[in-house]
Amino acid sequence: FKTTIVNLKEDEDNMISLFRIDDRLIHGQIMTSWSKVTQAKRIVIADDDVIKDQFVCMVMKHAIPKDIKLEILSTEDAIKYLLENDDEISTIVLVKTSEVAYRIIENGIKVQSLNIGGMGMKPGRKTIYKNIAASPSELEALNKIQSLGIDVEFKILPGDKGVRLSSL
């Protein structure tokens, strides 16, 4: 469950314990399962829309334990934050879409794996695995991520058997 995101500076890395696409961002599965398994002490949300909604940000901040630091940032600010914070604090990075995940990766955040936990059905999306759906551009972003040698895995809960994008 450990994924190391390597900073552009050699021999320095951020400890990202989970890099996950989940359109719900903070919810019960993240707080009761993933945060415990990863022993996360920080959650970074990269989302250009959520950052503009003060009410949603407040609700998310109240939904996590006080011993976990929450950073809700725009995608650009999240990239800068991850590059600048090269500490070893166990961190969960959450994004809503594969396009944002790819944007983070293409801007210098190197990852070994990407967890896909929630991409629900909506107009323009087709089911790609169980309850996970993607638009053509989202699927293209997932394929680009995979082509970089990054393990792309569908896994809702830590105890579930993961299914790799490459096996579909």
Where are the language model's segments positioned?
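Glycine-rich, aromatic-bearing surface loops/beta-hairpins
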Residues: S98, N107, Q112-L168
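Ordered, amphipathic secondary-structure segments that act as subunit-interaction surfaces
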Residues: E71-G117
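Structural motif
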Residues: I16-F19, K41-V44, K69-E71, S90-V93, ...
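Short gly/pro/ser/thr-enriched loop/turn and capping motifs at secondary-structure boundaries
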Residues: I51-D53, A78-I79, M121-G124
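Generic hydrophobic/aromatic pocket-lining and core-packing "Φ" positions
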Residues: M31-T32, A101, L142
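NTP/phosphate- and nucleic-acid-binding module
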Residues: V37, K61, P65, L70-L73, ...
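Long, hydrophobic N-terminal alpha-helical segment
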Residues: L8, E12-K69
